[in-house]
Swiss-Prot record:
Comment on protein domains: The zinc finger-like domain binds a zinc ion and is involved in self-association.
Record region (Zinc finger-like): 309-335
Species whose genome carries this gene: Saccharomyces cerevisiae (strain ATCC 204508 / S288c)
Residues with Phosphoserine modification: 18, 453-454
Keyword annotations: Cell cycle, DNA replication, Metal-binding, Nucleus, Phosphoprotein, Ubl conjugation, Zinc, Zinc-finger
Sufficient for nuclear localization: annotated segments: 435-512, 453-553
Annotated protein name in UniProt: Minichromosome maintenance protein 10
Subunit structure: Self-associates; assembles into large homomultimeric complexes of approximately 800 kDa. Associates with the MCM2-7 complex and the DNA polymerase alpha:primase complex. Interacts with ORC1, ORC2, MCM2, MCM3, CDC54/MCM4, MCM6, CDC47/MCM7, RFA2, CDC45, POL1, PRI2, POL12, SIR2 and SIR3. The diubiquitinated form interacts with POL30/PCNA C-terminus.
Classification lineage: Eukaryota, Fungi, Dikarya, Ascomycota, Saccharomycotina
Feature: compositional bias, Basic and acidic residues: 451-471, 548-561
Gene designation per UniProt: MCM10
Length: 571
């Protein structure tokens, strides 16, 4: 930000001048002054040649001091001849009588309309002639296009763009020679020249705008019937930004290699007004366009102070990336204002009675919010037509904030919602009730699992005896004994223990069964291996070899195989 108290040198390219100060306007003014001088000289000659006769009425005027007696004058012959002599030679009286005798025009005359119409036609012809003469004097390329220069490392202030450069692509003398007869318009001056609502091109035969490249897009194609290549890059002076569109295959191939941070001059670009889609027919701002094949961009040097805003967006987790002047600022204007508001909110003496209200609609943008596009500085707020019902509905649904608390939370990171603090006791009570219900459910689950594990309390004596006989018959098969573990997880022992104890077994068979059951119940194996043993593996291998020798071996060395082996066992 420039300090108004600082005394700076006069910059001729920073002052906004009128369009009449160009060379053609000065030449026309000199021509008009020459014609005026000639007219005045001729008028002076006529005045000198013609001597105005004296009026006899003013030769001798006598004012009587007091009333006198009226006397009858006797006219003489000489006096009559003298009066007739001067009557015909009085030019003033003759001219006055002629003007009085002319008929006056009626009140409803069209003389003013006709004069205005004729003047309009004359002005139009003058504008056409002026435009033709301006186009005849226009050039489309710089005079240094065919020369090749070696970049020069430097650290100086470039006079045409008022930007510091660390490298020059063209010497300063050659640059001044190339831009000698070209009007230089910086971005601030260009926005003052190209004004709404018409956004007409500046009235200069040759003009160029200067700035540094801060953004460059990818190559795209237009959506017309015959697609055309184009790309866009943005130039800036750290205060204003402007988009430049390059159309055409040759232009894209020539200018797509422009580097970010280069200071360039664009000669006589076309002004391209644009309007936002779906927001009426009014023109909002303008861009620049190059659609011809001439080389009209001159690379001056590489900027020294170009940088990017390093502030990270909390939602997207990406850096801001807005171009900044690293010699003056550490972040962009938007984040500087956010930091200023965060700092001023902590100081009571800086807080006013009324704060800047947060936007409730998309169209209402306070000074804190930067426009979404990069031409936010050039917003033209004009009258808009009434929107349709569907557009009004979409407009109402596009709110930035749901309520005022959300807006305050957006501006202040330490903001606490008062509604949340008021309901804090209710939330704490709900959390305690949830913990108690979870503990109660856990205890009830333990009790239910304990009752389901036994399941013999509600059984009758007959049912218990039946379950015992079924369990003993299952144990007699030896399947569970070969497994090496209890698959029922102890339920067999509970069934056998809870059954009715009868008399001692009458025969040895029942005693043996009881002994086997007890051994099985008390049998525990530390490591259970379900894979076949080594002996079983060797038996299978030898059996496989015997079968192979039988069918594919030599007939002399036939070996008899076991009768239990079959051809189906060959893999």
């Amino acid at each position: 930000m420039n300090d108004p108290r600082e005394i700076l040198a006069v910059d001729p390219y920073n002052n906004i001048t009128s369009d009449e100060e160009d060379e053609q306007a000065i030449a026309r003014e000199l021509e008009f002054m020459e014609r005026k001088r000639q007219a005045l000289v001729e008028r002076l000659k006529r005045k000198q040649e013609f001597k105005k006769p004296q009026d006899p009425n003013f030769e001798a005027i006598e004012v009587p001091q007091s009333p006198t007696k009226n006397r009858v004058k006797v006219g003489s012959h000489n006096a009559t001849q003298q009066g007739t002599k001067f009557e015909g030679s009085n030019i003033n009286e003759v001219r006055l009588s002629q003007l009085q005798q002319q008929p006056k025009p009626p009140a409803s005359t069209t003389t003013y309309f006709m004069e205005k119409f004729q003047n309009a036609k004359k002005n139009e012809d003058k504008q056409i002639a002026k435009f033709e003469s301006m186009m005849n004097a226009r050039v489309h390329t710089f005079s240094t296009d065919e020369k090749k220069y070696v970049p020069i490392i430097t650290n100086e202030l470039e006079s045409f763009s008022n930007l510091w450069v660390k490298k020059r692509y063209i010497p300063e003398d050659d640059l001044k020679r190339a831009l000698h007869e070209i009007k230089i318009l910086r971005l601030g001056k260009l926005f003052a020249k190209i004004r709404p609502p018409k956004f007409q091109e500046p009235e200069y035969a040759n003009w160029a705008t200067v700035g540094l490249i801060s953004h460059k897009s990818d190559i795209k194609f237009t959506s017309s019937e015959k697609p055309v290549k184009f790309f866009m890059f943005t130039i800036t002076d750290f205060q204003h930004t402007l988009d430049v569109y390059i159309f055409g295959k040759k232009g894209v191939e020539r200018y797509y290699n422009l580097r970010l941070g280069d200071v360039i001059a664009i000669l006589n670009p076309e002004v391209l007004p644009w309007r936002p889609s779906g927001r009426g027919n009014f023109i909002k701002s303008f861009n620049l366009r190059i659609s011809h094949d001439f080389k009209c961009i001159l690379e001056i040097g590489s900027s020294r102070d170009l940088g990017w805003c390093p502030i990270v967006n909390k939602k997207t987790h990406k850096k801001c990336g807005s171009p900044i002047n690293i010699s003056l600022h550490k972040c962009c204007d938007y984040h500087r204002e956010v930091q200023f508001r965060g700092t001023s909110a902590k100081r009571i003496e800086l807080n006013g009675g009324y704060a800047l209200g947060a936007p409730t609609k998309v169209d209402s943008q306070p000074s804190l919010y930067k426009a979404k596009g990069e031409n936010g500085f050039n917003i033209i707020k004009g009258t808009r037509k009434r929107l349709s019902e569907e557009e009004e509905r979409l407009k109402k649904s596009s709110h930035n904030f749901t309520n005022s608390n959300s807006a305050k939370a957006f501006f202040d990171e330490k903001f606490q919602n008062p509604d949340m603090l008021a309901n804090l006791d209710n939330k704490r009570r709900k959390i305690i009730e949830t913990k108690k219900s979870t503990a109660l459910s856990r205890e009830l689950g333990k009790i239910m699992r304990r009752r389901e594990s036994s399941g013999l309390e509600d059984k009758s004596v007959g049912e218990r005896q039946k379950m015992k006989r079924t369990t003993e018959s299952a144990l007699q098969t030896g399947l569970i004994q070969r497994l090496g573990f209890d698959p029922t997880h102890g339920k067999i022992s509970q069934v056998l223990k809870s059954s009715v104890s009868g008399s001692e077994p009458k025969n040895n068979l029942l005693g043996k069964k009881k002994t086997v059951i007890n051994d099985l119940l008390h049998y525990k194996k530390e490591k259970v291996i379900l894979a076949p043993s080594k002996n079983e593996w060797f038996k299978k291998r030898s059996h496989r070899e015997e079968v192979w020798q039988k069918h594919f071996g030599s007939k002399e060395t036939k070996e008899t195989s076991d009768g239990s082996a079959s051809d189906l066992e060959i893999i």
